[in-house]
Amino acid sequence: MTLKELVVGFGTQVRSLWMIGLHAFHKRETLMYPEEPVYLPPRYRGRIVLTRDPDGEERCVACNLCAVACPVGCISLQKAEQKDGRWYPEFFRINFSRCIFCGLCEEACPTTAIQLTPDFEMGEFKRQDLVYEKEDLLISGPGKYPEYNFYRMAGMAIDGKQKGEAENEAKPIDVKGLMP
């Protein structure tokens, strides 16, 4: 080892100690997580939930658009039909171990049944526990859109009345009849 190498090595050690001394008294960036809450942006996309409409029914009509829009294929569902003709998912399953929380399922949902909440604490010890069924995903409230009801907005038959036959509702316009 030459004298030059010894001086350079000593200089790097002094420089390292100087940097440690400078940063020893700065404010720390590490948060003590459970005690200090983490800042989440206003539109943070976290845990996925299934919501209900204002009448208390499931909003999901099992259209399968969320499963098609999902880039990793973590959503699976099966359509069933009630006696009144309304569709609902017989089973609805999300595998959160594969989900990338991109929000495409929420954007694709025409009934606003799927919504992403800011909840991010979903750690499990076993991978199988990250597969959520419909009962785990359903919440009791309407979520972000409390007044929205898909069947009323879509003009589906409600209580046996077709579109335009309910109270204070105009008859639908025949778009094809207006064409030249």
From Swiss-Prot:
HAMAP family per UniProt: NDH1_NuoI (MF_01351)
A GO cellular component entry from the record: plasma membrane
Keyword Translocase: yes
Identification of the protein by name: NADH-quinone oxidoreductase subunit I
Binding site for [4Fe-4S] cluster 2: C70, C99, C102, C105
Keyword terms, alphabetized: 4Fe-4S, Cell inner membrane, Cell membrane, Iron, Iron-sulfur, Membrane, Metal-binding, NAD, Quinone, Repeat, Translocase, Ubiquinone
EC number in record: 7.1.1.-
